[in-house]
Amino acid sequence: MDSKNTQVAIVGRPNVGKSTLFNRLVGERRAIVGDEPGITRDRIYGEVEWAGRKFSLIDTGGIVPDDDAVIPANILKQAGVAIDQSQLLVWVVDARAGITQLDEELAALLRSTGKPVLIAANKTDSAKLESESTEFFRFGFDDVFPISAEQSIGVGELLDRIVETLEHAVVDDAEPSASAELRLAIVGRPNVGK
């Protein structure tokens, strides 16, 4: 797995702990963290090494799909670039808040990418919240990881699955599919026997 070509984007709505998770995974405080929404506006890149594997990690600002204000629109654009560049998306949700309307919108957006999505149910720092984080399975993605980025709870399991998913993605990209659809276009002037 080549870290320069293997990228993982951390995405989610504002104030769910994306930058805290980013800092935890890269092992240093690179992204600014605060209680106010909209602190992270541009993409922030870092390198992660886990279980002998390296990959690039991208922190994004909080996504608000239907906000027409200039700053949120730019954040959405920056997040879109990160999503396009990545082979895997880590969707951070707030386990304390539960599912919100914005989470519903983001689920549809992330599903439309066709990329693998791992849900990190952040702020899960009690057994009750860990149990309640299973509600995020309702979005139809394969994995929900109850974590606390601040306290490093569940982060190792999330990293294990990131590495495993990236290894499968790299193998799948390297092997052409036998069922790949062939597209053919026959073009020419009208009435020439195409």
Describe the predicted segments one by one:
Residues T6, D84-L89, T113-V117, G140-D143, ...:
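Short glycine-/polar-rich loops that comprise or flank the Walker A/P-loop
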Residues M1-A73, K77-Q85, E167-K194:
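Conserved G1/Walker A P-loop phosphate-binding module
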